[in-house]
A protein has these predicted regions:
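Residues that define the transmembrane beta-barrel architecture of outer-membrane proteins
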Residues: 15-17, 35-41, 80-87, 101, ...
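Gram-negative (and chloroplast) outer-membrane scaffold detector with strong preference
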Residues: 41-115
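Short loop/turn motifs that connect adjacent beta-strands in outer-membrane beta-barrel proteins
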Residues: 7-16, 50-62, 96-102, 138-144, ...
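Transmembrane beta-strands of outer-membrane beta-barrel proteins
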Residues: 17-21, 60-68, 103-109, 144-148, ...
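Transmembrane beta-strands of outer-membrane beta-barrel pores
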Residues: 23-29, 47, 68-74, 109-115, ...
């Protein structure tokens, strides 16, 4: 498909791979600890493991992905915590490509290790779960992604109390899809 940027990538295809560098940030929402901001940045590797399934607008491909998160910054009222994370559980539904757009839904989960308790008075070991809606904008060699992500951080009862942090984030990334 010819575009102003040249030919667009094919996007997510069965047997393909994704690599991406991303960064995101957001603020806490009701349902957990308030007055907290989050910034995180990471690297993703994904495997597109199915061909196209489902009818109509639901048609798409399933991708499994992992994220290394070397930069977590949690801005809390009492301090700023720095941490790292690993998300080994990334389930992504890549909807059928529409022109240069490749929309997706994602569910993911992992761990967060920080230098201060997150939230304050809880624990330095936490678990993360997230749901995201986004799209890839496919270019000739690379793609940009933009998404809205709901992120939940909790110690899962490792410490008391366990108020958790709920945030809505905007995440952007640059990456590439390819087939071996």
């Amino acid at each position: 498909m010819a575009t102003g940027l040249g030919l667009a990538q094919d996007g997510p295809e069965e047997g393909g791979h994704e690599v991406q560098v991303w960064a995101g940030g957001g603020h806490s929402v009701p349902g957990g600890t308030s007055r907290t901001g989050i910034f995180d940045a990471g690297l993703r590797y994904g495997w597109v493991i199915t061909g196209a399934h489902l009818p109509g607008i639901l048609r798409g491909r399933f991708e499994y992905a992992v994220d290394a998160v070397p930069a977590y910054v949690i801005f809390q009222p009492s301090n700023t915590a720095y941490g790292v994370g690993f998300n080994p559980f990334g389930l992504k539904w890549n909807f059928e490509r529409r022109g240069r757009l490749s929309p997706y839904l994602e569910l993911s989960g992992g761990t967060l290790f920080s230098d201060h308790n997150v939230p304050t008075y809880t624990n330095t070991v936490n678990f993360t779960s997230a749901a995201a809606l986004g799209t890839h904008v496919l270019g000739a060699k690379y793609n940009w992604s933009v998404e809205v992500r709901y992120l939940h951080i909790s110690n899962a009862g490792l410490a008391t109390p366990n108020p958790g942090i709920n945030t809505v984030q905007v995440r952007v990334g640059v990456g590439r899809f390819w087939k071996k």
